[in-house]
Amino acid sequence: MAKQGDLKTQPRSEVQLELLRLDVGSAVALVGHPIHVMMVHFPVAFVIATLGVDIFFWWSGDAFWVRVGLWSAGMAFWSGVAASVVGTGELLLVRGIRLLEASWSHAVAAMTLVAIGGANWGLRLVDTAAILPHGLALSALASVMVGFAGWHGGKLVFDHGVGILISPKD
């Protein structure tokens, strides 16, 4: 049996202290795994792929890359919308997450990324001739925003322990 002052029973880091103080567990989870964390990889991958596709189109001029870019940008946008819906659910349902400033920074960066992704996909739907330079610029901007959103999302997990535990409400 552990004593009151035993190191094994006492939190040893700021993250552990914050986990005890705030409820920052996941409220939107599947078999104990936060759904938002499982979903965010897809829009990130599609945003980066769209930038690569645009660079290939710029380099080769092959119309094949126009169609691939349309699909990639569309998947980036729609998978981003899906991840955003789940992330917004976490933000609204878990008080401890709402209280963290980093949560709001991540949310704003992610919403900006989804808006840029939507503009990028919409541009490709309407005017394929505008891919160079506007689509390429939007793809580059979206890739930069992936970095900002990912940085703030990582801070939530590694600095604040968000999503590490299931919410006690479950």
Predicted regions and their residues:
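Polytopic transmembrane helical bundles with strong interfacial aromatic enrichment
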Residues: A2-S60, R67-D170
